[in-house]
Every structure is written in C-alpha cells, then in structure tokens.
Amino acid sequence: MASNFEEFVLVDNGGTGDVKVAPSNFANGVAEWISSNSRSQAYKVTCSVRQSSANNRKYTVKVEVPKVATQVQGGVELPVAAWRSYMNMELTIPVFATNDDCALIVKALQGTFKTGNPIATAIAANSGIY
C-alpha cells in the first residue's frame, strides 16, 4: 500500500489562495501536516489511529485554523495570529468494516460539513442550530 502521508489542500478556494498543508512530523503514531505560513499563522492538521478495543479502530483528527492578522511594531507590519480555532474529532470504526463501509463513512463526514447543510451553515455564521 502506498503512503498517504503527503501534501493536500486543506482549504479549497477554487485554486486561488488555496491552503495546502504538507507533512511535517510523524512521531509516536501521530501524523502532522502544516501549512507553509510562519508557525504562528500556520494551519495544522494531526491524525492518529489506534486500536481502541479488540473490535474497533479510533481515528483522532485535529485541525487548527488561525485568524491571520498583522500588527505594526517599530514601523514594520508583522504577521501575528490573533486567535486560533480548533476542531477535534474522534471516529470509531469496527475493524471488520469493509472498504465500501468506510467510503460511506467518509461521504457522511463530507456531507456533515458541506456548504449549505445546517452544521456548516451554523459554523460559517458563528451561530447555533435553531
């Protein structure tokens, strides 16, 4: 099986200003991807997979999204991160799930955050579900 620890587009802006993250570290079973921005302004993704029981694998995915801003110090405009948003997700899949089962799970995840769906709309508007 080929490695899947490779660069990918995290934020798709239609090809203009896309945010790509590249492999940066793989230690203790945790894969890390980071964007090319300065460390304080970088997007970061981590993922680990572990056996949570005899019958289950648990995927833990974390995404950090920075609020990119600038600040003037001594007449020089410097980039700073005003704050960060964090997403943490745990996904448990039975070890006996087929590839088709897992592909369906991925489609469900994509649908959950698809633009226009209630959860994505609430997050995009920084509001709740009502």
UniProtKB/Swiss-Prot annotation:
A UniProt-annotated Pfam family: Levi_coat
Record-level Gene Ontology MF annotations: RNA binding; structural molecule activity
Gene Ontology cellular-component terms listed: T=3 icosahedral viral capsid
Phylogenetic classification of the source organism: Viruses, Riboviria, Orthornavirae, Lenarviricota, Leviviricetes
Gene3D superfamilies for the chain: MS2 Viral Coat Protein (3.30.380.10)
Subunit structure: Homodimer. The capsid proteins form dimers that assemble by group of 5. Twelve such pentamers are linked together with free dimers. The homodimers binds to the viral RNA via an operator hairpin, but also to many other RNA sequences in the viral genome; this interaction probably shifts the virus from the replicative to the assembly phase and ensures specific encapsidation of the viral genome.
Function in brief: Capsid protein self-assembles to form an icosahedral capsid with a T=3 symmetry, about 26 nm in diameter, and consisting of 89 capsid proteins dimers (178 capsid proteins). Involved in viral genome encapsidation through the interaction between a capsid protein dimer and the multiple packaging signals present in the RNA genome. The capsid also contains 1 copy of the A2 maturation protein.
Location of this chain's protein in the cell: Virion
Main subcellular location: virion
Biological process according to GO: regulation of translation
Domain of life: Viruses
Keyword terms, alphabetized: Capsid protein, RNA-binding, T=3 icosahedral capsid protein, Translation regulation, Virion
Segments for region (Viral RNA-binding): 32-105
Name the record gives this protein: Capsid protein
Similarity comment: family membership: Belongs to the Leviviricetes capsid protein family.
InterPro entries referenced in this protein's UniProt entry, alphabetically: Levivir_coat, Phage_RNA-type_capsid
Species annotation: Enterobacteria phage fr (Bacteriophage fr)
